[in-house]
């Protein structure tokens, strides 16, 4: 077993906790909505935003596996950056659905009031994600076909630009289109991801 793998296994514990907390927060909020004694007015965009938070959280779990042999995983500052990134991921999850349901909830109104905060966090996450991607690909970029680099750069551009637009836009059509685009890009990115 290499030193990188041992370091990765050591670091994985805290990452697993942060990922688990993020998913548990969404599950708890969704459970409260389902069991609320007061009326809940459902909204597809709010639910799609929560689903997107789950997808990028699970995606990060797969990405962790991809960096398990990177030498820089053993460095304190990279670990700190990764913890900060997972903290932002938790904030995304925690802000995706309301916590209080006792007085009734209108998810459309919740999303309208919350979308700027939620998508700003997603933007921060994606900028950090791209920066880490550049860090990890930097040493092998000369061995990657130019077409693949262009595809990755395009994907990264969408992952940063779309949440910026969603944070600023009020139009529900733009939100449906933006969320659909984000799902398409993320699913395309992870389509061949395997933990083995």
Task: Pin down the residues of each PLM region.
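Membrane-interface helix-boundary motifs at transmembrane edges
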Residues: 32-45, 69-73, 102-112, 166-177
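Hydrophobic transmembrane alpha-helical segments in integral membrane proteins
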Residues: 1-22
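Central hydrophobic cores of alpha-helical transmembrane segments
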Residues: 48, 175-187
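Membrane-proximal helix-loop-helix units in multi-pass membrane proteins
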Residues: 83-153
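A generic, lipid-embedded transmembrane alpha helix
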Residues: 42-67
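Juxtamembrane boundary at the C-terminal end of a transmembrane helix
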Residues: 138, 187-196
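Alpha-helical transmembrane segments of polytopic membrane proteins
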Residues: 12-16, 74-87, 146-159
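Hydrophobic, membrane-inserted alpha-helices
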Residues: 156-165, 183-185
